[in-house]
A protein has these predicted regions:
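Helix-enriched interaction subdomains in cytosolic or periplasmic regions
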Residues: 96, 102, 107-147
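C-terminal non-catalytic regions of proteins with extracellular/luminal or membrane-system context
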Residues: 1-6, 13-20, 26-36, 51, ...
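Short acidic/histidine-rich active-site segments
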Residues: 21-38, 42, 56-60, 64-75
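A polyampholytic, Gly/Pro-enriched intrinsically disordered region
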Residues: 45-56, 60-61, 338-339
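Conserved short secondary-structure transition element at the edge of the structured enzyme core
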Residues: 11, 18, 54-65, 103-114
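Short acidic (Asp/Glu) and glycine-rich catalytic loops that position anionic groups and cofactors
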Residues: 35-42, 61-62, 74-84, 117-124, ...
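Short, hinge-like loop/turn segments at secondary-structure boundaries
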Residues: 41-46, 309-313
Length: 385
């Protein structure tokens, strides 16, 4: 019971011998180091071979037929693995094995002609890299991906020279992907120079005709807290998982004391809960003047918390701020449609079946629109087809 790269059956017997794969095999990232005993740490994952030394782990992977080590920055464990292998199998065997990997890796370079002609003609490169035609096509793709979820009263597009207020954001410190702490952030979503390409900068809600509120989908700490599992929330306010399953499907690793990973009854928090406050407080300050929410969506979002306070909602999945401003100004028409369902609430999320598509009950906004897979509006409020 070992990780795939350590499995002779998976790599050597099946992949190499039975299915005849002759290409490069690379390990997952960071699987050869000693694991961190802390559950809430991005430690190495040498599953099933914790009793081997780092060099011995490298040797086992090499002898299985793997060619590259993902995330390893130090050649010494590979060299030590070679020396151990020479003692165990002989230098001829080890050299032949290393040459096999060298051939596989180098063939990828040979096939693309990088050895025969590794040089570039600068003028030719300029015709392709950053070529105006491709830049325009790429930017249009950004615009086409933006989804208009709500447009109450046809607020969008905003007229040129509309006085627009954009509030600052605050995100508390949180753990990043590698589990290190990220500092808190004060964010100015839009520069004055960029906004004034279409609109007039307003320093306060009182001066503004409309507000653009930039927020992100809920940012969580990855499901761990104080050595235990907690829910990963898709809502902004603290979420207590009352409807989560009592017994988890999977568990556990050697770092865990309990095979049950259930987080039922536990509470998860988001680093950007203040994004919700930003929408609510901006709406209060703006009164009857329109508030447009610009949502950067990293994952499906429970929109029920902020949607009632928004006159319009634009959702995007990684486009530039310029693209969002151009869309708000009507430079392009909305063509984007949701690639996921946006759930009604977290209870629905907990009850849905992870291996079945489209079984979520999607959120319905005050305009009667259902934020289901494939949903999107045009500026006239008609659903895209």
């Amino acid at each position: 019971n070992v990780g795939n790269s350590y499995s002779e059956y998976m790599i050597k017997d099946l992949l190499r011998e039975k299915y005849g794969y002759e290409g490069v095999v690379c390990t997952d990232w960071d699987i050869t180091g000693d694991p961190d005993p802390d559950l809430d740490a991005f430690g190495s994952r040498c599953y099933g071979v914790e009793d081997l030394s780092v060099a011995q782990r490298h040797l086992r992977i090499i002898m299985n037929g793997v060619d590259q080590f993902g995330g390893n920055q130090d050649k010494e464990p590979v060299m030590e693995a070679y020396r151990i292998g020479c003692d165990l199998y002989g230098e001829e065997t080890m050299r032949r094995r290393m040459e096999e990997s060298a051939v596989r890796i180098l063939m990828n370079i040979f096939r693309t002609g990088l050895f025969e002609n590794p040089y570039l003609e600068e003028e030719e490169s300029k015709k392709t890299v950053g070529a105006e035609e491709y830049v325009k096509a790429g930017y249009q793709a950004q615009l086409d991906s933006i989804v208009l979820l709500k447009n109450k009263g046809g607020i969008l597009p905003l007229k040129e020279k509309t006085r627009v207020y954009v509030p600052k954001r605050h995100i508390r410190g949180r753990k990043g992907f590698f589990r290190g702490m990220l500092p808190e952030q004060e964010i100015r979503p839009v520069s004055r120079e960029l906004l004034e390409k279409h609109f007039i900068w307003a320093d306060s809600p009182q001066e503004a005709d409309a507000a653009l509120v930039f927020i992100e989908s809920p940012l969580t700490d990855g499901g761990f807290e104080n050595g235990t599992y907690v829910p990963i929330s898709l809502q902004y306010r603290p979420y207590t998982a009352e409807h989560a399953r009592e017994t988890s499907i999977a568990g556990s690793t050697w770092r865990e004391n309990d095979r049950n990973r259930s987080y039922q009854g536990k509470t998860g928090h988001t680093a950007n809960e203040e994004d919700l406050d930003l929408v609510i407080n901006t709406k209060k300050a703006m009164g009857e003047k329109p508030v447009i929410v610009c949502l950067t969506m990293h994952n499906p979002t429970v929109c029920s918390e902020f949607e009632p306070y928004a006159d319009a909602i634009l959702a995007e999945f990684g486009v530039s701020t310029k693209a969002m401003l151009d869309m708000a100004a009507g430079v392009s028409v909305p063509k984007g449609r949701l690639p996921v369902q946006l759930p009604r609430d977290m209870e629905i999320v907990e009850k849905h079946r992870e291996d079945v598509a489209f079984d979520l009950e999607a959120y319905i906004d005050e305009e009667g629109n259902c934020y289901d897979y494939g949903f999107g509006l045009d500026f006239q409020g008609e659903k895209l087809s």
